[in-house]
From Swiss-Prot:
Induction: Is transcribed only in the presence of nicotine.
Organism: Paenarthrobacter nicotinovorans (Arthrobacter nicotinovorans)
Family matches, as InterPro entries: Amino_oxidase (IPR002937), FAD/NAD-bd_sf (IPR036188), Flavin_monoamine_oxidase (IPR050281)
Pathway per the UniProt entry: Alkaloid degradation; nicotine degradation
EC number(s) stated in the UniProt entry for this protein: 1.5.3.21
MF-aspect GO terms: oxidoreductase activity
Protein name: 4-methylaminobutanoate oxidase (methylamine-forming)
Positions bound to FAD: 31, 33, 39, 379
Record family assignment: Belongs to the flavin monoamine oxidase family.
Reaction it catalyzes: 4-(methylamino)butanoate + O2 + H2O = succinate semialdehyde + methylamine + H2O2
Subunit structure: Monomer.
pH-related activity note: Optimum pH is 9.8.
């Protein structure tokens, strides 16, 4: 049995820990927060109609989330159809531009890119479109909101994921997405140590890893670093690395996003409306009761949008703009807004990751290649589901598989040395 340290109890870390624990390995999970889940964070919002679950972090479960669905089934959890589509958003602050127009332009962009293999940035692709500037900007807004980075930085490949433009269904976990990490952590029991901030990680010359936290120092056979991108880039942590890994990390972009939740006086219909100017979208969705929750949800993406909104100093302005955008909804004048700005979360340093041009399968593999006995997991390293809950889970499970292979190799070497003796 190996002794394995897992740094971070987000979905990546918990996925790795779960797979290793099921294989009989001895795992210890260090989590700086007082809860599991990381950027998966469910809470309740009081409304005139009662209290309703909201997602302050990761929200939508989409097509292709096979690993997440398997874990949900394993832990007896279910999904709820939101009744609206993550992919289709009606522009609410443009004149003469409809969702159908954006869909058509997005498909034109993908056709233009088909011969080039989606090389370059999304902005370079947008510059080739013959459409009116206002329509191109609406598509640009769609890209920047969803990737949470600038179109001038993110790879044009991002359009393949966000610009499906088909009204595919979207789901959430019944009772809140937080229920999955809660269940996974509960199954691990005392192996999860909360309030433990990692300060240093060091490979030991003759094998093993030294991990220093606020409270003690521990030695492990292997360690899985499942921390957010901004945290692993923190020079103060001084994680083991290589030149190849550092080069690969340069192609990973830190996304910045914020969420807003407002109570509603009446029960609305499902909806999805985007602000092109503000780089945010709003939605109302069905919950586990089968009815539409009286909550307006909003998500703002990209560093420039967050900076312009100045949410820390002027949070009420976003509320006012959302109210002006959604005149179809009954938002109380004294509505108690709940704003979450992930850039201000010191344990996250931002929302999720996106990829810059030049990212390859080999490059993302480098992000997960172990450095000594230190292994890596996180949504930022996932080639297909970057930035998503599914990507975090897949990455964590891959890390667990690599750790088990390493432990088998070490065990085989030890047996061989004993036989020679």
């Amino acid at each position: 049995m190996g002794r394995i340290g897992i740094l971070g109890a987000g979905l990546a870390g918990l996925a790795a820990a779960t797979k290793l624990a099921e294989a009989g390995e001895n795992v210890t999970v260090f989590e700086a927060r007082n809860r599991p889940g990381g950027r998966v964070w469910s809470e309740t919002l009081d409304t005139p109609k009662g209290s309703y679950v909201i997602e302050r972090g990761a929200e939508f479960v989409l097509d292709g989330y096979t690993s997440m669905r398997r874990l949900l089934s394993q832990f007896g959890l279910s999904l709820v159809d939101t009744g609206m589509s993550y992919y289709v958003r009606e522009p609410g602050d443009t004149t003469g531009i409809t969702c159908d127009d954006i869909i058509r332009t997005g498909r034109e962009a993908l056709e233009l890119a088909s011969g080039s293999g989606l090389q370059g940035t999304a902005e370079e692709l947008l510059a080739k479109l013959p459409d009116e500037p206002e329509l191109v900007d609406a598509l640009r807004a769609r890209i920047e909101i969803s990737t949470a980075v600038s179109a001038s930085e993110v790879t044009a490949r991002s359009l393949q994921h966000i610009a499906s433009f088909e009204p595919k269904p979207s789901w959430r976990v019944a009772g809140g997405n937080q229920r999955l990490p809660d269940a996974m952590a509960a199954a691990l029991g005392s192996a999860v140590r909360y309030g433990e901030t990692v300060r240093a990680v060091e490979n030991i010359s003759d094998g093993g890893v030294l991990v220093t936290t606020d409270t003690d120092t521990s030695v492990f056979d292997t360690v899985v670093v499942a921390l957010p991108l901004a945290v692993i880039r923190d020079s103060q942590l001084n994680l083991p690395t290589t030149e190849a890994r550092d080069a690969a990390l340069k192609h990973v972009l830190q996304g910045h996003a914020a969420k807003l939740h407002l109570p509603l006086e009446t029960q609305p219909a499902t909806s999805a409306v985007m602000s092109v100017e503000g780089r945010y979208w709003t939605w109302t969705a069905t919950d586990e009761s089968g009815a539409v929750a009286p909550v307006l949800n909003a998500f703002m993406g990209s560093p420039s949008a967050i900076t312009r909104a100045n949410l820390k100093q002027r949070p009420a302005e976003w509320v006012a703009k959302a109210r002006a955008l959604r005149t179809d909804l009954a938002i109380p004048q004294d509505a108690a807004a709940l704003t979450t700005v992930w850039s201000e979360d010191q344990l996250a340093g931002g929302a999720y990751a996106a990829h810059a041009p030049g990212v390859t399968a080999a490059g993302t593999a480098l992000l997960e290649k172990p450095v000594g006995d230190v292994f890596w997991a996180g949504e930022y390293s996932e080639p297909e589901f970057v930035g998503l809950m599914e990507g975090a889970i897949r990455s964590g499970e891959r890390a667990a598989g690599r750790v088990m292979q390493r432990l088998e190799t070490k065990s085989g070497n030890s047996d061989s040395e004993r036989s020679k003796a």
